[in-house]
Regions:
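Lipid interaction determinants
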Residues: 7-95, 101, 106-170
């Protein structure tokens, strides 16, 4: 069973809060984009997953493991599951944009709020080196409340990342 937090069943008429952050191609070398970042801590027994793309798009979510090794599960059952990834990219949730300023990384993604709308979520942290980042805060824009998480993510090389094309990010 594959479960990514934030998956929902939106249609074109549903409410979609704007990200408020423009997508810009990432040309830096502060973080690697030829793989994914995996959290060292879990949230409700699910590890955090961040995938960064050179076009400025990101995937930021938690994955549920079905008993396999986490790396094997993420690579085979999540990232290489073409039909699942197609459904994920066609819904406005867990996807967004990122930007890097000096040693700060900011990811803004959508999250499912209720059956008919999404909200923007900010994950902000610091770059330790090109293979390690730490998310310090998560803020939900509608609530104006920050959650301090201090979750370290380590890079895992992976050359077969799924395409990042989505109609929700221009």
């Amino acid at each position: 069973v594959v479960l990514l937090l934030g998956c929902n069943f939106f249609n074109e008429n549903d409410s979609l809060e704007g990200l408020g952050l423009e997508r810009h191609p990432y040309i830096g070398k502060e973080l690697r984009t030829d793989g994914y970042y995996l959290a060292t801590k879990t949230h409700k027994n699910m590890p955090g997953l961040i995938v960064l793309y050179r076009n400025g798009v990101c995937l930021c979510t938690y994955v549920e493991n079905s008993g396999k090794s986490t790396k094997q599960y993420i690579e085979n059952d999540v990232l290489q599951n073409k039909s699942y990834m197609h459904r994920l990219w066609s819904k406005p949730t867990a996807i967004g944009v990122f930007m890097i300023t000096k040693r700060t990384v900011a990811l803004r993604t959508w999250e499912y709020q209720n059956k008919r709308s999404t909200i923007a979520i900010d994950n902000v942290g610091e770059i330790i080196n090109d293979t390690t980042l730490r998310i310090n805060t998560i803020a939900r824009t509608y609530a104006g409340v920050q959650q301090f998480v201090y979750n370290v993510y380590h890079f895992v090389p992976f050359s077969n990342k799924p395409d990042s094309t989505t109609s929700f990010i221009k």
